[in-house]
Amino acid sequence: MSDSEEESQDRQLKIVVLGDGTSGKTSLATCFAQETFGKQYKQTIGLDFFLRRITLPGNLNVTLQVWDIGGQTIGGKMLDKYIYGAQGILLVYDITNYQSFENLEDWYSVVKTVSEESETQPLVALVGNKIDLEHMRTVKPDKHLRFCQENGFSSHFVSAKTGDSVFLCFQKVAAEILGIKLNKAEIEQSQRVVKADIVNYNQEPMSRTVNPPRSSMCAVQ
């Protein structure tokens, strides 16, 4: 195969991650791109970039450019520019925070406006994060599924903390954008286990302790 033929098998996709500041967007992007979970909560100001190259069926190499948009940018002058040109949009909410789910209407409104102006239609995925906190859920699954059905979204439930279905979410979004169908064996083959640290959302200084820091396993699917 020539160099030009090899290059033709490489694709780049722009994936924009939107949602409220506490929905876990940055943790989601970090778990996918770096296979880890941050020790401290860090608010995204403006936007952050993450890159990861994956291989889809047919030996197709795809580089995902993940744009993590700060939650405070809603209503800002730059948001439409961040969204412009995206092939995929992840609308992320915290399943334990109903307000973060309701606010997705505002985020999606901006996406629709940009899509109409640019005459392009990105794939939109609804992502319910923090499924490791199922016992604290305030957004019922039927609400999630109804929102998907009403707007034609793909549906995903993940945990950036444990890594549950994180890789699978991005993999499925990329495959759907490119019109590639994943079979069961390919999905199972993508499952791996990596080390991840548990986040501390308390921004106050931590007191000293003689106990070693806790950690968990981030099972990226």
UniProtKB/Swiss-Prot annotation:
UniProt-annotated stretches for the region Switch II: 68-85
Example of a GO cellular component annotation carried by this entry: plasma membrane
Membrane-topology annotation of the record: Lipid-anchor
Keywords on record: Acetylation, Cell membrane, Cell projection, Cytoplasm, Cytoskeleton, GTP-binding, Hydrolase, Lipoprotein, Magnesium, Membrane, Metal-binding, Methylation, Nucleotide-binding, Nucleus, Phosphoprotein, Prenylation
Essential cofactor(s): Mg(2+)
Residues with PTM Phosphoserine: 8
Residues that coordinate or bind GTP: 21, 24-27, 38-39, 41, 44, 71, 129-130, 132, 160-161
Family the UniProt entry places it in: Belongs to the small GTPase superfamily. Rab family.
Record protein name field: Ras-related protein Rab-28
Organism, scientific name: Rattus norvegicus (Rat)
Gene: Rab28
